[in-house]
Structures are given as C-alpha cells and as structure tokens.
Regions:
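Alpha-helical linker/hinge and terminal dimerization helices associated
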Residues: 33, 37, 75, 118, ...
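N-terminal helix-turn-helix DNA-binding core of bacterial DNA-binding proteins
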Residues: 35-78, 164-167
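Base-recognition residues in the alpha-helical recognition helix of bacterial helix-turn-helix
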Residues: 24, 53-57, 83-85
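N-terminal leader segment of winged-helix/HTH proteins
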Residues: 1-45, 92, 172-173
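Short, locally clustered residues in the helix-turn-helix/winged-helix DNA-binding domain
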Residues: 27, 56-60, 123
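Residues within helix-turn-helix
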Residues: 68-69, 80, 87, 107
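C-terminal regulatory/oligomerization modules of transcriptional regulators
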Residues: 1-17, 140-173
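Charged, amphipathic alpha-helical coiled-coil/dimerization segments
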Residues: 2-4, 8-10, 87-145
C-alpha cells in the first residue's frame, strides 16, 4: 500500500529581503517626512497637506485645471476622498468644478484666483520645510538617484488617466 502524503503548497514568490527592506524604508521615510510637513503647514497656515497638494497640482496644470481622475492620480487621496476634499475647497472658494463638455459624467477641478493666492501665501513656508526635512538631508547624488528610482516606480505603476475626448487628442482643423 502506498502512502500519500499531502505536500504543502509552495510559497508564492515574494519580494527579496533587499526589496522588503527598501519598501519598509520608503514607507517610514514617507510617513515621517509627510507628517512633519503636515504639522508645520497646519501650524503656520492652517492648511492641511492634502489641500496644499491639490492646490499645487492644479496650479501646475495648464489653465489651472485637471480632470478629477487626473488629479486623483497625482495626489495622496482616493478618488472618493478627493471628491470630498474638492467639495470642501469649492465651498471656501479655492477651486470650482466644471462639467466636461464632451462627457457630462466627468468634471474638472479648476483653481480659482482665491485658491492661487492661498497657495502663494503657504508656498514659501512649505518650501522651507521641504528643504529642511528633505533637501538638507540628502546630497545631490543621493537626490538624483532617488529621483530616478521614484520616477521609475511611478512610470511602472501609474494608470493611464481618464480624460475628456478633448484631453486625449487635440481636435484636427
């Protein structure tokens, strides 16, 4: 009589120890630096980092406007969290929403003049904090290596943003 032993399923392949160590360091660095930036921005400007980030991303976009889906891909919030945040910012006049002309289900977030002024008032202090907690800690070579590695991660993981038909390709004359 043959004895059949049940073999355990093989462990799925996982990250190498180096990858796990890098991942943990990335998470910890992200947490401690963003908490420090948040604390200082709220203390000096009464502006949470997520709100600053939305205002900044809009200010960097053409015409100060982005599709909500595009904005969600650029900030530290879920799409539902971004919707609630944009509603709050709209309520205090820092952004406004516009319907996408070619897709009524889609919307743009647009930076207002008041929003641009609010961002400008917060920017100098925030940039000093970024320099203190980030720029002063790494040398130029470390900064460039980190930028290249992070850009590679973004490119490998960023989903293609949704857009209005007019965002996808410019109209042909």
């Amino acid at each position: 009589m043959q004895s059949h032993q049940i073999q355990p399923a093989p462990e799925p392949p996982g990250p190498s120890p180096q990858a796990m160590a890098a991942w943990q360091s990335f998470l910890q660095a992200h947490t401690v630096v963003t908490r420090a930036l948040e604390r200082e921005l709220v203390a000096t400007q009464r502006l949470p980092l997520a709100e600053y980030d939305v205002l900044f991303q809009l200010s960097a976009a053409p015409d100060g406007r982005l599709r909500m889906a595009q904005l969600a891909d650029r900030v530290l919030l879920s799409r539902s969290g971004l919707t609630r945040l944009v509603e709050r910012l709209e309520g205090v006049g820092l952004v406004r929403r516009e319907v996408c002309p070619s897709d009524a289900r889609g919307a743009y977030a647009v930076l207002t003049t008041t929003g641009r002024a609010r961002l400008r008032a917060a920017m100098a202090g925030h940039l000093r904090s970024v320099q203190e907690h980030f720029g002063d800690v790494l040398d130029c070579q470390q900064m460039e290596s980190l930028r290249v590695a992070l850009d590679q991660l973004v490119a490998a993981n960023l989903a293609e943003p949704a857009g209005c038909a007019q965002d996808v390709a410019p109209p042909k004359p």
